[in-house]
Amino acid sequence: MKEGWEQLDEQQLAQGYFFDRQKECWVCLDCLKEFDRQEIFAFDGKFYTAQKAVQLHQKKEHPDRLHKILEEEKKLLSLTEKQEQLLERFAAGMTDAQIAKEFGVSASTVRHQRFVFRERAKSAKLYLAVWQMVQQQ
């Protein structure tokens, strides 16, 4: 990811774009392309607002966003290779049974790992809240 992503919230990081209030434009996090709020953008013969245009741009130009983040932020994420692969399968919409068959494990093992990811996400959310409280002191 480009520099400065630390100031963005988790929704902005996940969707891959944010609104720059100073420049009055939507910005793609991956390539920093700007979509001026006052402009109308053409995609595939249709016209879109800047926000919709940056969404379409993100899907078309950066469809591998999850994989890219998993690769580039290995140190921060602290995930094993198998965990990264599981997350990519979850994102692709594969069922627990399909994933289990591919990995040669039981579906309950996959369900347990999904549970572990949810617990880790809850922990991260609470950690962020605590850190914000500490910084406000």
Task: Give the ranges of each region predicted by the language model.
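Short helix-coil-helix linker/hinge
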Residues: 77-83
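Residue-level signal for the short linker/turn that defines the boundary of a DNA-recognition helix
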Residues: 81, 94-95
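Amphipathic alpha-helical segment used for protein-protein interaction
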Residues: 63-77
